[in-house]
């Protein structure tokens, strides 16, 4: 309890001086998911018009205590796991898609001569502080120095395990890629953190043309955003859809289950690949509002009409109360129940998959 109070006080005191300067990242027209001040999920419109709150740090902590009283503390990896790191090719010019799993929600996607990173995090701690927070449980599947020239970086939202500033700074210094993210995030990165990125902000349903044969769309997700203690829902979260000549790719970012998977399928018909989160789902009463369980990830896979799905967002950072192995165990159980075999897979960190 003392540790919890100490962490809260440190975060609060560090955040307080920047409350008035950092809580507003976007000013634009009111929409069905923006009330002029804050963004909200379409499915809980009524609640969000009244309040920008979804239940925060204290709500999670109380839920965590109650969960541990019944189930005990989660069994988690206490030493960092090493793997054989993959060395990717410089680029892929043929008609194939190369997918390399770096860990958590970070993938290297290589297609049509482009190298794309999703939600890159190479830090050892997913936190505003380098000394406290969720620690990395497994090394990145590709050494940073072995990354090919990165052309595009997709950032789904502002949480620390998805928008990792130390990694973004390293990518900018080495590659100067194009960053693509939701409304308000470029303002934060460039105006509040002075990173001088080539950065494009997208609203839901917006797209940006990368080349004649490749578009990147930003689509609805069910989540939220925040940096430090303040600025809740001041920037937009979402999923990315890469529309290419070799097929459509869906990157879910962080999301709870809702109709947005079916909405994407109605527009794009099918997906060659979907990257779907399966971790951070316990305690269910709190976490499933904005995260997928393995069962829900399988349903999302079906909703999207995905030919192949790869699991992500598990076994890298301890973000919730499931045991280290639970996401994979629960996914395999659900696959057996639904008779889904090789369409939804676990791609180990450091492994590469080629789709043709």
List where the protein language model places each region.
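Metallo-beta-lactamase
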Residues: 2-130, 140-141, 182-253, 272-278, 330-351, 355, ...
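Cap/insert and terminal regions of metallo-dependent hydrolase folds
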Residues: 12, 17-28, 33-36, 40, ...
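Catalytic core of the metallo-beta-lactamase
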Residues: 104-110, 210-272, 288, 292-295
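Active-site metal-binding loops of divalent metal-dependent hydrolases
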Residues: 120-122, 158, 184, 221-223, ...
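Acidic/histidine-rich helix-loop elements
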Residues: 122-139, 224-231, 282-291
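Active-site metal-binding motif and surrounding structural segment of the metallo-beta-lactamase
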Residues: 132-181, 269-275
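A short acidic, amphipathic alpha-helical/loop segment
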Residues: 166-171, 192, 260-264
């Amino acid at each position: 309890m003392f540790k919890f109070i100490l962490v809260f006080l440190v975060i609060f005191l560090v955040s307080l001086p920047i409350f008035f300067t950092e809580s507003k990242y976007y000013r634009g027209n009111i929409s069905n998911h923006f009330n002029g001040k804050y963004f909200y999920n379409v499915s809980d419109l009524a609640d969000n018009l009244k309040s920008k709150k979804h239940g925060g740090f204290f709500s999670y902590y109380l839920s965590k205590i109650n969960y541990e009283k019944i189930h005990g503390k989660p069994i988690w990896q206490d030493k960092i796991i090493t793997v054989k790191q993959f060395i990717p090719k410089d680029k892929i010019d043929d008609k194939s898609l190369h997918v390399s799993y770096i860990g958590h929600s970070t993938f290297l996607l290589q297609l049509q001569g482009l190298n794309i990173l999703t939600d890159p995090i190479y830090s050892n701690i997913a936190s505003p502080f380098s000394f406290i927070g969720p620690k990395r449980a497994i090394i990145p599947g590709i050494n940073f120095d072995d990354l090919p020239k990165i052309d595009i970086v997709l950032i789904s939202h502002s949480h620390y395990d998805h928008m990792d500033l130390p990694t973004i700074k390293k990518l900018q210094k080495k590659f100067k890629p194009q960053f693509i993210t939701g409304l308000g995030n470029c303002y934060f990165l460039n105006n509040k953190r002075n990173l001088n990125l080539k950065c494009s902000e997208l609203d839901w349903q917006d797209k940006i043309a990368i080349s004649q044969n490749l578009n990147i769309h930003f689509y609805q997700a069910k989540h939220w955003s925040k940096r430090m203690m303040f600025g809740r829902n001041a920037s937009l979260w979402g999923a990315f859809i890469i529309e290419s000549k070799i097929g459509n790719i869906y990157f879910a970012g962080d999301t709870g289950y809702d109709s947005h998977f079916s909405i994407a399928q109605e527009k794009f018909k099918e997906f060659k690949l979907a990257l779907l989160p399966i971790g951070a789902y316990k305690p269910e009463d709190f976490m499933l509002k904005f995260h997928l369980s393995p069962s829900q990830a399988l349903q999302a896979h079906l909703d999207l009409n995905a030919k192949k799905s790869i699991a992500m967002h598990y076994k890298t950072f301890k973000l919730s109360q499931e045991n280290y192995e639970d996401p994979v165990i629960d996914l395999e159980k659900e696959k057996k129940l639904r008779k889904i075999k090789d369409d939804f897979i676990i791609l180990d960190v450091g492994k590469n998959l080629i789709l043709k």
